[in-house]
Swiss-Prot record:
Function, in words: Transaldolase is important for the balance of metabolites in the pentose-phosphate pathway.
Catalytic activity annotation: D-sedoheptulose 7-phosphate + D-glyceraldehyde 3-phosphate = D-erythrose 4-phosphate + beta-D-fructose 6-phosphate
Biochemical pathway: Carbohydrate degradation; pentose phosphate pathway; D-glyceraldehyde 3-phosphate and beta-D-fructose 6-phosphate from D-ribose 5-phosphate and D-xylulose 5-phosphate (non-oxidative stage): step 2/3
This enzyme's EC code(s): 2.2.1.2
Family membership noted in the UniProt record: Belongs to the transaldolase family. Type 3B subfamily.
Keywords: Cytoplasm, Pentose shunt, Schiff base, Transferase
UniProt name for this protein: Probable transaldolase
Electron transport as UniProt keyword: no
InterPro entries linked: Aldolase_TIM, TAL/FSA, Transaldolase_3B, Transaldolase_3B/F6P_aldolase, Transaldolase_AS, TSA/FSA_arc/bac
Pfam families membership: TAL_FSA
Subcellular location: Cytoplasm
BP-aspect Gene Ontology terms: carbohydrate metabolic process; pentose-phosphate shunt
Length: 214
């Protein structure tokens, strides 16, 4: 399973990339706004750090505007993936961009049928939001299982990006289900590396080393 980092914070991206576990990056307008920088500048800098798919989201709500934005974004770097909302206009734009050979990531997916529509429209990636579903007492990981089954049944090549990840258990379940990608906040990536027994073991080794004659 591939790990994308879900952030527009260049410092976090750089640090996670140095761990050797980051295969790509997902951003959205909210994450870009937190950076306080120009959209294009942030995307350009990220593209220079991670050699993998970089999802950059359009903000237009209608087809022609989405296409216009997408054509400008892909000029920034060959690794740019256009992030589109799961709406009828977003599906139209997905079809158009797919025909042009431009990679797409259909986002804000909350049902298996939305994922199926996106795959049929030619999406490169689909992004179901598990955490937001959990927040309203629905089974976020359950829809990942259903999407995986549907795509496998019919041979759809769209990759499943598990998004809105809130904790390490979401990552574990994504891997067990067979999702293609988990896009993970920096804080959760760091949690994945931690275990109290690891820390205790290191502490014990160092204490014992101090007893070794020098």
């Amino acid at each position: 399973m591939k790990f994308f980092i879900d952030t527009a914070d260049v410092k976090e991206i750089r640090e996670a990339h140095e761990l050797g576990v980051v295969d790509g990056v997902t951003t959205n307008p909210s994450l870009i706004a937190k950076s306080g920088r120009k959209f294009a500048d942030v995307i350009k800098e990220i593209s220079g750090i991670v050699d993998g798919p970089i999802s950059a989201e359009v903000v237009s709500l209608e087809h022609d505007g989405m296409i216009s934005e997408a054509e400008e974004l892909v000029k920034i770097h060959p690794n740019i993936v256009i992030k589109l909302p799961m709406t009828p206009e977003g599906l139209k734009a997905t079809k158009t961009l797919s025909a042009k050979g431009i990679k797409t990531n259909v986002t804000l997916i909350f049902t298996p049928m939305q994922a199926l529509l996106a795959a049929k429209a030619g999406a490169t990636y689909v992004s179901p939001f598990v955490g937001r579903l959990d927040d309203i007492s629905q089974d976020g990981m359950g829809i990942i299982e259903e999407i995986r089954t549907i795509f496998d049944n019919y041979g759809y090549t769209a990759e499943i990006i598990v998004a809105s990840i809130r904790n390490p258990i979401h990552v574990l379940n994504s891997a067990l289900i067979g999702a293609d990608v988990a896009t993970i906040p920096f804080s959760v990536i760091m949690q994945l590396a931690k275990h109290p027994l690891t820390d205790a073991g290191i502490k014990k080794f160092l204490e014992d080393w101090e007893k070794v004659p020098k």
